[in-house]
Amino acid sequence: MLYSLHMQETIQNKVYTLRMRNGATQEELANAVGVTRQTIIAIEKGNYTPSVLLALKIARHFQQPVEKIFTLV
């Protein structure tokens, strides 16, 4: 598929929803996936797009397919 250079794409995620559903703190999730709490905050706010490796670690932590957590819009 070809994309226009003018096309603005963003990633939406369900990290906050899944974390709350699981009763985990930002610190607990951060420790589980090997990042800082500030990184989790930025991901949840949509201010930071995680690397593929981090997205996969988050998906594994929540036992969800990565595409159920992160969506290209």
Language model features with spans:
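N-terminal flexible/basic segments that precede or flank functional cores
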Residues: 1-9, 16, 21
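Short, charged recognition helix plus adjacent turn
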Residues: 1-6, 60, 71-73
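Short basic helix-loop element that most often maps to the first helix and adjoining turn
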Residues: 13-32
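Residues in the recognition helix of alpha-helical DNA-binding motifs
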Residues: 32, 43, 72
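Recognition helix of helix-turn-helix/homeodomain-like DNA-binding domains
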Residues: 35-48
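DNA major-groove recognition helix of helix-turn-helix/homeodomain DNA-binding modules
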Residues: 54-68
